[in-house]
Every structure is written in C-alpha cells, then in structure tokens.
Amino acid sequence: PGDLEAGNLKDAGKRLPLVDRVVFRLEKEVLPLWTKFLQGYYDRSGENHGNTNSMFDQAFVVGPDGVEMSPDIADHGIQMDPDVKPGIYYYGFNMRDPVVGGYTEEKRKLRRALQIAFNVEEYLAIFRKGNGITAQNIIPPGIRGHLEGEAGVNPYTHEWIDGAPVRRSIDEAKQLLAEAGYPNGRDARTGEPLKLFIDVQSQAVDNTQMNWMDRIFGQIGVQIEYRPADWNRTREKLLTGNTQIYSYGWLADYPDPENFLFLLYSPEGPLNCKCDGSNNSNFESEEYDELFRQVRVTPPGPERDAMVARMVEIYRREAVWLYAYYPKDIYLSNPWVRNTKRHGISKATLKYINIDDEMRERKRAEWNNPVTWPLYAGALLIAGMILPGVTAYRRRQNATARRSDNN
C-alpha cells in the first residue's frame, strides 16, 4: 500500500538489475562515511544498517510527529526510509523459575506488575533514540496476525486513550504486586525484599541501562541485579534453565505468524526437548500447543486468523515476557537514488536500485564546489598588512640615502 504514490513502481517491468555495477567500500569510522555521504560520494548511508545512530543528533530532530530529518539534511533532498524490522527483541521470564515462573493468578499478577513497571516507551526513547516500537503482540508489523490501533493493544499493560496506547500506571503495578504477595516489593511471608536477576550478553548492556533499570523497578520496591556474560555462557544457562529473566530476539525467516508463535511452543523449550530450542521461557500450555499444531496445517483465512488471535491472547494473559519491542532502523539515500524501500526479510534487493547518474554528477559538483573567496580575502588582508610596512621601510631607506648624499 502506498508504493504507487511514493514512486516505488516507476521501474516496474524493467529488466533486472537496474544498475550495471555496485561498488562497496569499507569505512573504518562512521564520521568519514557520513561526510562522504553528505558530499554525494556514497549513494546510501549504509547497507546492513542505516549508520544513522552515531550521527543521530546531526541527522534528525525529534518533533511533535516523532523523528524528522534536520533542516540541513532535508535541504539536501535526502530521502528517509524508516524500516521496522519483522522481528522482536525481548526480556523473557523463565516459567520454571520458582519466583517469577508458574501459572497461578498470583504469579501472573507478579509478572504483569513487572511488565507495567518496565516503561518500554521511555527505554526506547533513551537508549534506542526512538528507533523501536513497543510490542503489544508477539507478532511484529507486516506479518499477518499483527493488529494496529485499539484492536492491537495489550489490555493487561496498556489502555487506549485519545487514540493512542497509554501504559498503565505505577499505582496499578504496585496494586498487582501486593496482590501477588509482595506489598511494597517485599515478601508478605518473610519480609525479604524481592530481588530479580537478569542474564544478558556482556556487550548488550552498560551501566547507564542498569542504573535506569534500578530506578524504574525501584518505583515498585523491586531490586534488580544484572548478570552479564559472554554468549556461550548465557546460552548454557538457557539450555539448562538456569535463568530467571533473560534477553533474546528473533528476526523472521519467512513472513508468517507461525515463525513467531513457535517461540512459545512447549516442544521448543530447551528443558523439554533437551536441545537448543527457541522457547527459552520454557512456557507450557496445552491449549497453545494444540492451536499451534492446527495453525501449521491450516491455510491462511479467517479460521487461522482466529487461532492466531487466541494464541496472542494466551501470550498476553500469561505475561510470558517482561517486555518486548519491534526494532526499527532509519536509512538515508541521496535524491538520485530510486526504489529505496527496504525489504524486511530478503537481502537480495540491490537489483531493484536505480540511479540518476546525471543528477548525481550535478549534485556532487554543486555540493563540492570549491569556495575560493576566503583565499582571495586572506591574500588582500595579508597585502594590506604588509604594504604599510614596505612603504615605511622604503621611506626610511630613501631618507638614509639623502643624508648620506648631503654628507
């Protein structure tokens, strides 16, 4: 939808590829890559990712409608292509854990309280520069089964107010925590504070994020401790179920809800299959599993959509993941590049790119036209400084010569 209006179909029906040659150059630093892009020597800001995060403040401004190009970038005629990936990044609960796991109403309330407290919108604004969308659903945008608007809101964590999803209040989180047996973040039986452990890869978290987590969970009296480790150690913990909360992510292999719903299919749980399964939460639900088996063999249509919707509801009701978001990247292309729309799954898209060579050469000359007036101005300034000295020197020499003649 919208491709015709955006001009993405101008080259439809032409023989592929649309360009004869593609040249890749490896830049070791972001700054020279960015500078050359603005000078017109690179057609796009990046291929594997947008390369815009490091230069975000120069490239974008955050306006009332979200992230927009800065005036300088917009004046260049540069095209902005936001790309919401068909994927999901999340922190999941280990459903076998004695504290956060389990399927009683008290355990659900505990997990929901933690979900509400984790302000994903704030997290994305601070640590991802707004490049992400809060996940209300296990299925990302662009995949059948993902719903937008009020119909797509997770009612356990958000409300629909004035045409937008609004996170439920910290007071609600505190109430749920008390009903779960942890008033003010303390075990009602022992009085001990509730302390949770999050396993992450070492490079995926820094002190700023850990301090932020301490603050947001401190609002409901819950203590958090990160346990960073390399991927091999983290994977070993997942395989043995030796985690409480873990970080993970998934990008689509193919555009079907099955490719995400299987993340909670119990035979995929490492503790069930004794394998490298993808259900790292070790979530188990007979109803969910049966629906998943039916979804696998049912063709797309209303019947299958209803099954998928029911599975999404089970995921929400059981509060299997602490938080989730859909990753987003922003790609920039110079004005002579056509067909810049990204494909979320396929990487073989360079054959669709087209270039207006004449415009590229014209813009390069315009943007890199040498500015010579400072040289002339500098020369005049230097001449203006030297000329009085030369004149005075000559006068002095002439005066000395006249005195010599008189003697």
Describe the predicted segments one by one.
Residues 100-101, 133-180, 201-208:
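Structural transition elements
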Residues 275, 333-369:
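Long beta-strand-rich cores associated with HINT superfamily self-processing modules
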Residues 381-395:
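Alpha-helical transmembrane segments
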